[in-house]
Amino acid sequence: MRYSSGAVEALIEEFAKLPGIGRKTAQRLTMHVLQERRGEVEKLAAALIDVKEKVVRCSICQNITDLGTDPCLLCTSTGRDRSVICVVESPTEVLAFEKTGHYKGLYHVLHGVISPLDGVGPDDIKVRELLARISPDSEGGVREVVLALNPTVEGETTSLYISKLLKPLGINVTRIARGIPVGAELEFIDEATLSRAMDGRSAV
């Protein structure tokens, strides 16, 4: 059943486009917005606009960063091990590893994985940018690349593709330990398990 208000239906449809949000949840969110004070709704609207206007991708690691902070704080930190790069699918995995307080290297965010069924190929994710960071012409010093992609078919395909590109460059390519359940998403794995997975990484 649809609401008679076109504005309500339009907001429900927009909420329902978000990952993991079905129509029922979208309806609840819409009702919440309707019941909130105007000032709170305006703050939400402003935050949505700000995140599109003031957040960019780091020119080095492709992680998200505020406009005016490029390269990002992780890439410019003097306390990171610059010889190791951990490759992840999205910024949420960077946050997950940082929460462990265990990994001290750098990151590279692919913003996706190879998925032929979805029409996503190597050129559609940030593989080229990764290669540029560790090519012989780069300022690098990178000795190890850790593949920390989700244990899915697409993640495995992407890991294999990247490892084949990196091995001829003499880079030590490793992957996090297989204690992560197949099909699980790294952003939802607890810190202790992620730390053990990083410690137990093995050569590809």
Curated annotation (Swiss-Prot):
The keyword Transferase does not apply. A zinc finger (C4-type) spans 58-75. Pfam families: RecR_C, RecR_HhH, Toprim_4. Residues 83-181 form the Toprim domain. GO terms for biological process: DNA recombination; DNA repair. May play a role in DNA repair. It seems to be involved in an RecBC-independent recombinational process of DNA repair. It may act with RecF and RecO. This is Recombination protein RecR. It comes from Chlorobaculum parvum (strain DSM 263 / NCIMB 8327). The gene is recR.
